[in-house]
Amino acid sequence: MKIYLVGGAVRDQLLGYPHHEQDWVVVGATPQQMLDAGFKPVGKDFPVFLHPETQEEYALARQERKTAPGYTGFAFHADETVTLEQDLLRRDLTINAIAMDEEGTIIDPYNGKRDIETRTLRHVSQAFCEDPVRILRIARFAARYHHLGFRIAPETLALMRDMVQAGEVDHLVAERVWKELSRALEEQHPAIFIQTLRECGALHRLMPELNALFGIPQPEAHHPEVDTGVHALLALERACELSSTPEVRFAALIHDLGKGVTPKHLWPSHHGHEQDGVALVEQLCNRLSTPNQFRELAVAVCAYHTHCHRAFELNAKTLLKTLLALDGLRRPERFQQFCLCCQADAQGRTGLENRPYPQAAYFLQALEEIQKVDAKMFVAQGKKGAEIGEAMYSARLQKIKLLKTAQTPHE
């Protein structure tokens, strides 16, 4: 029996990159030997065990064989005759197909170290194209290691395109797509994830509402980048600088979906794209089984981002109505996230990344003012039922009017 550290831990150790989990492969052992050594079986489809002390995963070396379309259509073979090289051959990328023995010696049969040095994401073998999840994974690795200079090998990108054209991505279930997308949103450069999916054709299949934005023009006076899809990626990049919260990043990415359905004869204007986009955001989130906190923020940003941009132009009633519609009183944290998304949108434009966005602070200040209105003061005055609600509305409106009177004029 021989035990090797494999996968991400070895890769990131060679990169000098932080890693939090360690995976191990065991060569020359049987399931019974693992049980006799105190390991706990956890693998449903193939022999995987938890170490009795560290709780880290130890898998018996195995081979895979494609039996049906999709990422679940595999048969596995695992016994003591499977070699380390055979186990590493089934892995997705060469940089993930490196092992380290208990003495610290590197075993690298597929030149993963070379690809780490040249910053290349390259498939190990043609078996790469048998699992469509690998398209999402390589896009996520491209997003994670972009700042280190990693790029996808041309032949690997060509394989990804072939997989998309063969319909492999159509077999991905929504939960798996969302799992990879949500993880990508937490990487340093999630825009690279989206760009990679677009380059191989997968974005059209998985997120057609977003893919539709590329090539649609916006007024150059407001959007020097012109292309709506490019703007979506710039907004995402700015959101990443403003917040590490994946909900904020997701909402910034899809805030302009409504521009994808603007009739061509109206281009480059997109009047009403906010409400047009809400149904598309809902549609996308339904298809991906997106968690509620992502969906709710994305819908709010889509519907009201231009209200925030026009904050200083809104009259008191409209501003109050907007704050209430955004549920700012009950959900102040989400309201702050909304304001960050609006800032990311405004600054996610070529050459305007550092332009001040005082509208966000103004919106937050307006919310702070109406938070000062307490129902107790009206109850103490003897008001009841609907009278309390009316009095609170009037008091809040007065707070907004005073704020508007005191505000410094903005351009």
Swiss-Prot record:
Role played: Catalyzes the addition and repair of the essential 3'-terminal CCA sequence in tRNAs without using a nucleic acid template. Adds these three nucleotides in the order of C, C, and A to the tRNA nucleotide-73, using CTP and ATP as substrates and producing inorganic pyrophosphate. tRNA 3'-terminal CCA addition is required both for tRNA processing and repair. Also involved in tRNA surveillance by mediating tandem CCA addition to generate a CCACCA at the 3' terminus of unstable tRNAs. While stable tRNAs receive only 3'-terminal CCA, unstable tRNAs are marked with CCACCA and rapidly degraded.
EC number, UniProt record: 2.7.7.72, 3.1.3.-, 3.1.4.-
Protein name: Multifunctional CCA protein
Domain HD: from-to ranges: 228-329
Residues reported in the UniProt entry to bind CTP: G8, R11, R91, R137, R140
Signal peptide: none
Note: A single active site specifically recognizes both ATP and CTP and is responsible for their addition.
Positions bound to ATP: G8, R11, R91, R137, R140
Gene3D superfamilies in UniProt: Beta Polymerase, domain 2, cca-adding enzyme, domain 2
Reactions catalysed: a tRNA precursor + 2 CTP + ATP = a tRNA with a 3' CCA end + 3 diphosphate; a tRNA with a 3' CCA end + 2 CTP + ATP = a tRNA with a 3' CCACCA end + 3 diphosphate
Annotated PANTHER family: MULTIFUNCTIONAL CCA PROTEIN (PTHR47545:SF1)
Entry's family note: Belongs to the tRNA nucleotidyltransferase/poly(A) polymerase family. Bacterial CCA-adding enzyme type 1 subfamily.
Nucleotide-binding in keyword set: yes
GO BP terms in the entry: RNA repair; tRNA 3'-terminal CCA addition
Domain of life where this protein originates: Bacteria
Binding site residues for Mg(2+): E21, D23
GO molecular function terms noted in the UniProt entry: ATP binding; CCA tRNA nucleotidyltransferase activity; cyclic-nucleotide phosphodiesterase activity; magnesium ion binding; phosphatase activity; tRNA binding
Subunit structure: Monomer. Can also form homodimers and oligomers.
Cofactor note: Magnesium is required for nucleotidyltransferase activity. Nickel for phosphatase activity.
Cofactor: Mg(2+); Ni(2+)
Domain notes: Comprises two domains: an N-terminal domain containing the nucleotidyltransferase activity and a C-terminal HD domain associated with both phosphodiesterase and phosphatase activities.
